Amino acid sequence: MFEYPQGYELIAGVDEVGRGPLVGAVVTAAVILDPNNPIEGLADSKKLSEKKRLALADEIKEKALAWALGRAEANEIDEINILQASLLAMTRAVKSLKIQPHFVLVDGNKIPKDLAIPAQAVVKGDSIVAEISAASILAKVARDQEMEELDKQYPEYAFAQHKGYPTKLHLEKLAEFGALPQHRRSFAPVKKALEQF
């Protein structure tokens, strides 16, 4: 049973989006909510419609005491692996907050080791901790927008549809057109595509 840490005024929630895709950055967000300005309907971003996510993202940015995004690029993911890159991107999001929190709640079961702030990992935190839900929404909206931009650059890959995840469609496009500079070379399907071209 999750309980909020006692004795801390400013608590940030942190989450990441984009561990599974074959392309682009892993994107994180850190959010400190305002207890006097609650937001209705916060939930795990994966369980919300796109329309609801966009509306909530605007409300979070408006009402939160502080929010920030972090990222680790595809080449960093290839260099240090996706887990380490996710943790690095989480640290970057926290360090970018305009107000530094007194405590950080991190989605999942690992805490970035270089946070320098007391922290706790919360499994399924994006469903049970409002701050982490808010972070998951901001990260998902930001990453989806990046995939839509990439889709405009490379329409033949259909990134707006699959958002870079290894769907049947994405794997077909990868086999047909090869890997882009934005693809994660350490991921098996990309490696395979690079060998074929």
From Swiss-Prot:
Keyword S-adenosyl-L-methionine assigned: no
Subcellular location: Cytoplasm
Highest taxon of source: Bacteria
Keywords, sorted A to Z: Cytoplasm, Endonuclease, Hydrolase, Manganese, Metal-binding, Nuclease
Pfam families on file: RNase_HII
Gene Ontology BP annotations: DNA replication, removal of RNA primer; mismatch repair
Transmembrane feature ranges: none
UniProt keyword annotation of Metal-binding present: yes
PROSITE patterns the record matches: RNASE_H_2
Gene3D superfamilies: Ribonuclease H-like superfamily/Ribonuclease H
Stretches assigned to the RNase H type-2 domain: 9-197
Binding site for a divalent metal cation: D15, E16, D107
Cofactor(s) it depends on: Mn(2+); Mg(2+)
GO molecular function: manganese ion binding; RNA binding; RNA-DNA hybrid ribonuclease activity
Stated role: Endonuclease that specifically degrades the RNA of RNA-DNA hybrids.
Protein name: Ribonuclease HII
The gene coding this protein: rnhB
